[in-house]
């Protein structure tokens, strides 16, 4: 069986990136919560 984690930087950015979060109301809520919590990173690091 194929493993679930098949690294792909583009997919990671498109799914979890900052611009992807900003696109939807829910994504903006995620960023708001993470800012409130004081997270260093709002979105996963993507070195493309």
From Swiss-Prot:
InterPro entries: Ribosomal_bL34, Ribosomal_bL34_CS. Keywords: Ribonucleoprotein, Ribosomal protein. Residues 1-48 are annotated as: Disordered. GO terms for biological process: translation. Residues 1-22, 29-42 have a biased composition (Basic residues). GO terms for cellular component: ribonucleoprotein complex; ribosome. One of its GO terms (molecular function) is structural constituent of ribosome. The keyword Ribosomal protein applies. Gene3D superfamilies: 1.10.287.3980. Pfam families: Ribosomal_L34 (PF00468). Part of the 50S ribosomal subunit. Belongs to the bacterial ribosomal protein bL34 family. The open reading frame (ORF) for this protein is entirely within the ORF for the RNase P protein (RnaP). The two start codons are separated by four nucleotides. This is Large ribosomal subunit protein bL34. It comes from Thermus brockianus.
């Amino acid at each position: 069986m194929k493993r679930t984690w098949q690294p792909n930087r583009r997919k990671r950015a498109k799914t979890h990136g900052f611009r992807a979060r900003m696109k939807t109301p829910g994504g903006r809520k995620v960023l708001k919560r993470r800012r409130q919590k004081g997270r260093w990173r709002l979105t996963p690091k993507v070195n493309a």
